[in-house]
């Protein structure tokens, strides 16, 4: 029963933080260290990634019409635009896809620790504040996904590649990259959601293969529960973010990241001293 409660809490954390640019990994590490689930470290490492399937399904459900090139409600032109959007998503996915397959384990081994995660939280928090101050009063040059050029897509893809470092935040990194080249906040956030679909499905599949699909019945149940909770909270988080950025900038998330990074550093130092 205690593990069920812990998994529900982790699902809530994943669902809320996956789409807000605050690093779901940073939060899962912090909450995981506090809750200390009784499952094996190998299972929890896989759980932290595969639980993202629930989050990504929220994007698929919320944007199904926009993502679906076969929708009977779309004209031929609209279907072609949808296919073009998917091509853009795939182009932007190339950098992270290549580096992720080749170096994901190495990056996790080096950076999947509280202090490196905290540092990345703070670094990108500062970046959000600097970029928003730089863009203040400027009109975005890109207000539709269809306006993104190949060069822009690879630039955004480069920032998604940087998000392979835990604590960076996939949504945070790609949004910062998009804002730097004049993309509007709404388009930056929406394209980030779409870009996450192949990245998160791929990462989850890779972890499942590495884990060998060797679940006990209890572990499979906990994984499904985490995904379901993550899905529900992700729907709420996505709707909140898209509504919020219509009236506000991303600086509040920058300040939050800096505070959270500082708290993780303090918490880690305290844990080290106590140990």
Walk through the language-model features, giving the residues of each.
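Multi-pass membrane proteins that catalyze or facilitate reactions on polyprenyl-/lipid-phosphate substrates
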Residues: 1-275
């Amino acid at each position: 029963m205690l593990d069920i409660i812990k998994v529900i809490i982790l699902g809530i954390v994943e669902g809320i933080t996956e789409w807000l640019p605050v690093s779901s990994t940073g939060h899962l590490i912090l909450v995981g260290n506090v809750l200390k689930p009784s499952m094996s470290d190998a299972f929890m490492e896989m759980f932290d990634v595969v639980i993202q399937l629930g989050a990504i399904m929220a994007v698929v459900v919320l944007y199904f019409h926009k993502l679906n090139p076969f929708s009977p409600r779309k004209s031929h032109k609209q279907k072609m635009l949808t296919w073009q959007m998917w091509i853009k998503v795939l182009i932007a996915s190339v950098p992270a896809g290549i580096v992720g397959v080749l170096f994901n384990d190495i990056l996790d081994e080096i950076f999947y620790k509280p202090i490196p995660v905290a540092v990345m939280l703070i670094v990108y928090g500062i970046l959000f504040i600097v970029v928003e101050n730089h863009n203040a009063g400027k009109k975005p040059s890109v207000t539709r996904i269809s306006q993104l050029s190949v060069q822009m897509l690879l630039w955004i893809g480069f920032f998604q590649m940087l998000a392979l470092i835990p604590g960076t935040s996939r949504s945070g990194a790609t949004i910062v990259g998009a804002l730097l080249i004049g993309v509007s906040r709404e388009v930056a956030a929406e394209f980030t959601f779409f870009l996450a679909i192949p990245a998160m499905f791929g990462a989850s599949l890779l972890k499942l293969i590495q884990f060998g699909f060797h679940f006990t019945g209890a572990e499979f149940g906990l994984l499904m529960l985490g995904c379901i909770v993550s899905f529900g909270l992700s729907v709420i988080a996505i709707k909140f973010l898209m509504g919020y950025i219509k009236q506000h900038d991303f600086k509040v998330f920058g300040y939050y990241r800096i505070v959270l990074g500082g708290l993780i550093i303090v918490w880690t130092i305290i844990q080290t001293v106590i140990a």
